[in-house]
Amino acid sequence: VKPRIAVIADSPDEHWPSMDLVAEMLVSEWQSHFSSEVETEKLELPIPHVTRAVRDSKAALNVDRILGRFVRYPALALRERSHFDFFHVADHSYAQLVHALPSRRTGVYCHDLDAFRSILDPAREPRSLPFRMMTKTLLAGLQRAAIVFHSTRETGRRLEKFVAPHKLVYAPYGIAAEYKPDFDPNDGADEALASLNGAPFILHVGSAIPRKRIDVLFDVFARLREHMPELRLVQQGGALTAEQNDQARRLKIDAFLLQPPKMPRTTLAGMYRRASAVLLPSDAEGFGLPVIEALACGAPVVASDIPTTREAGGEVTSFAEVADIAGWVAATLRLLETGPDGRVQKARVTHAQQFSWNMHARVILNGYLSLQSPQ
């Protein structure tokens, strides 16, 4: 009998593209290529509109998010616990759900350790007592799970300090079909980039949260423009803070910064293909999906020299130390001045092709099949 596995996804109202992607790809692969072995269904809920009904503010949204994660989602888990053979919590920041599910039949995908930093490294991320109590609930849920998946060897190594090693399974991400080197005049990128009027640009894909180091990105771009005044910066996915906007104005780069609205994967792939370089200056990443997406499109990449992006980018990616502005400028200029190279581009694409959502889905399915008790 085929097992029934529920994939519990983040609320779509969270607007975390990478988390939405991993849940989408897993369900899609299981339904498209593994339907003879598994039945699956994605479970997700909107963020409740409770506190915001009284006062619409960021603080109210955060309260509603907590209500969603710690009240509505656990209630959903309790209702569904008898309807599936296994439960896959697609994002570790929802690991509190393990407490409402049969732990021996529940797994969690741990993408990074950021959600646990306030208790694992309180000096680096001091938080309030209520926040730390919620975080402890998350960590306890992760530890209770029967199986914990992770995307990089480095994350697995760090997880071994507080999760039983026999529970850990390495299941790296994949590349969506849209990310490929073939030029497509109908991908929508030309329209999205029309205001650049054909100027060369560097691309950053990701949010504007602190660990993404938008400050470094802006400093590097300002220095690059001293060498290449025609250069532009395209940032996709970040809602800039007042401080970041102030920095852009102070550096006099705000007029050369383009932030298109959220684009479909087809258009984002076109933006990767047209970019002179893709930069990822984060000081921490669970994996660094933009690295392999860009490489799959043949784009040159400069990433922070941290273990996880080293794993993702391999020898076909350029690296610079975190926040070393001069190092970043030098590494990026080398790529910009070298120009396109068919042999190097092919090597990038070949490297990226080792990452497969099909294999990702296969590994995760095998993990749950291994939990099945003999009948």
Region spans (language model):
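Carbohydrate transferase catalytic cores enriched for Leloir-type hexosyltransferases
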Residues: V1-Q375
